[in-house]
Amino acid sequence: MNTQTTNENPLGSQPVKKLLMQFAIPSIVAMLVSSLYNIVDQFFIGRNVGELGNAATNISFPLSISCIAIALLFGIGGASAFNLAMGKGEKEKAVYYIGNSAVMLFGCGVILTTITLLFLEPLLRFFGSPDNVLSYAKTYTGIVAIGFPFLILTTGSGHLIRADGRPKISMICNLTGAVINTILDALFVSVLQMGMAGAAIATVIGQVISAGLVIWFLSHCKTVTIRKEHLRISRSIIARVSSLGTAPCSNQLAMMLVQIIMNKSLKYYGSLSIYGEAIPIACAGIITKVNQVFLSLIIGISQGLQPITSYNYGAEKYKRVKSAYLFASTCGFVIALIAFLLFQFVPRQIISIFGNGSESYFQFSISYFRIFLFFTFINFMQPITSNFFTSIGKPKKGTFLSLTRQILFLLPLLIILPLFMGIDGIMYSGPIADGLAGAVAIFMVWNEFRTRPFR
């Protein structure tokens, strides 16, 4: 029997708009849930601990980004390899991609936890922690690090479960942990007054429960059956998965590097301004995480696009690939435009959600929102287009595009502009990098659609 005509999934036949909504909505929910872990902690910490607590979560944020980077490396990489193989009818080979990816997700999480706990204080100082924030950051990060293997497994396996044709299951796994985290945050931080430790413990418990659900559903796949031999690590399998997951992973690693440089710059140039060290770090941390909610919507769309484009490209249905990309980009633009309007017109109301502060605190926050995120309305192009190239088996293009904003444009601007403009230079680096990265993405995808398969 032809494996492509069994009940694997309808990726090659159903209307692409219907498929994108079917896969993107659970992906968006999953990404929102991942962002809300940080947002919920920020909310309760801001209202019960204060500015120093908010600054502490921003100092530890590079480690959270590291977790997402690993999850995307083996999650999107494994899902893309799986769908490309299934599209070609290579079902037996496809199952190895899921098994190997799941093992690598958890194993890398254990390694990251070990490194973090062994070098906790040096890492936090390297990330730019001021002295008056360090104790808060150590308490929070030392506990949250225990949950890294479960966070990475849950986030990465969500892509594998979606690739198996079960996007709603992936959404349920993530949503369950987030709801539990929110309830426990309210109990531990607001009621029991456990501060930073309470927020961290709530986060870890939610992640462990989500990981348990993921393990159950991975062991009961819809289109393939995972056996013990599929869990044995194969160099060739991991190499293929890693090549396809490099683009989204590189983007996260670049984001982590930028976050570290950003924290150090905010600390240094903040000390030379009227704001001091802590206010810029606390404000930038909140705004970064609010922006992550917007980016979660965009990344969710790109992840929902991935199985559709991978399968149809493997099956040589190029018109469906192009149609899916264009519809995803249209959805991304609408979301980006709404985010732009919110960031420009109600920044004070947004920042007030996370607690009160001095007038200097609000002054910096409002300026940072309006300037740094000015080109939000074109920020959808880079993540959607980068993931598109990866999903059709062109990881080099995807990787290059994923690094344009963070490494090619933003990082040099963060170093150069503040030399002439002080802390304002940090703010203006954002829109310049966003505009240039969007232009590169448009040029690359326009060139791709001029090639023979798509004409």
Model-predicted regions and their roles:
Residues 1-24, 82-149, 191-246, 309-374, ...:
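Short alpha-helical transmembrane segments in multi-pass integral membrane proteins
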